[in-house]
Amino acid sequence: MAWFALYLLSLLWATAGTSTQTQSSCSVPSAQEPLVNGIQVLMENSVTSSAYPNPSILIAMNLAGAYNLKAQKLLTYQLMSSDNNDLTIGQLGLTIMALTSSCRDPGDKVSILQRQMENWAPSSPNAEASAFYGPSLAILALCQKNSEATLPIAVRFAKTLLANSSPFNVDTGAMATLALTCMYNKIPVGSEEGYRSLFGQVLKDIVEKISMKIKDNGIIGDIYSTGLAMQALSVTPEPSKKEWNCKKTTDMILNEIKQGKFHNPMSIAQILPSLKGKTYLDVPQVTCSPDHEVQPTLPSNPGPGPTSASNITVIYTINNQLRGVELLFNETINVSVKSGSVLLVVLEEAQRKNPMFKFETTMTSWGLVVSSINNIAENVNHKTYWQFLSGVTPLNEGVADYIPFNHEHITANFTQY
């Protein structure tokens, strides 16, 4: 899915005692392991006292085996200190799993989430698929803590999924698969067989839809939704009719890593577990070892040293034509920046040259997101946001990650999702 859709999920968020293991064909070749270790180090180094405390990163660190114990301890402390009132059900679910994977007691977070999910209902019968992402995380977290108490919640959630007819979303489908697989594997002995039948039916439906998103090159949806989809396809008790070539997917992801596509810490957190042979179902089985630093094996051939960068010109347009919004505009500016600069630098230079291009950002688990341009701000209630496009193609990276090329036309379009 497009980068913004992943960010949107962050706004809305956000086995029965046995360890799971991805299929052997998914194993990363030993020669490529330093490549995977390299992105893990990059992810762990993003953890600082001033950074957004991201539970997905802590889960990935613990499932993979953390290298940077100081970062691990800092992030654990930050999440333990988080205010439950500031968290959505998805964020609360992730935080519970992150603390569980750190062998820490989540305290009252579990009972709070339990109560919230008992009162949960979608906003409408055909709510967007992304509206089910946070509840999927919540059910997965609750399943790992008390599956029996979670059963009525999961049954209602599964029936709601069956009745929903909104367009399919790979990330949401993958997370729902993990949640319902946990419930399927933990149905109490002596319970009605109808529970297993219901969960199996929903899982079969979702997994078939995920399999329809597998591209010829192995990518599932897009490169940033592939990590969660790999987890889902590797553990589901209801495999799809279409065979999944896990090796092809793994090889393609490794190739994307070589090309530098995985440098955003959140994108690394979502792909790392699968590359390490783990899934979110392994969270309760993480063994917390005594404190000792582990030095990873990293790639031995560093890239070429820095060279003096030439300037490039980026054509930048801001556009708002939404009815009901007072200020309508379509303005274009040519901006000169150093080659290799991220899009954020382009926006800053445009703002310096013309106050009409003034913008504001918000920090999320996926990094900086542009929340306002020319005093027109996104609004969750109105489902409006600033979408960035290259030509007519939505960008799949954020402004702090995307690197524009010479004479590229970037448009920031105020639109609705």
From Swiss-Prot:
GO biological process: cobalamin transport; cobalt ion transport
Gene Ontology CC: apical plasma membrane; endosome; extracellular region; extracellular space; lysosomal lumen; microvillus
GO molecular function, one term: cobalamin binding
Residue numbers bearing the Phosphoserine modification: 191
Binding, cob(II)alamin: 171, 222, 270, 365-370, 386-395
Cellular compartments annotated: Secreted
Tissue: Gastric mucosa.
Family label: Belongs to the eukaryotic cobalamin transport proteins family.
Subunit and interaction comment: Interacts with CUBN (via CUB domains).
Protein name: Cobalamin binding intrinsic factor
Origin organism lineage: Eukaryota, Metazoa, Chordata, Craniata, Vertebrata
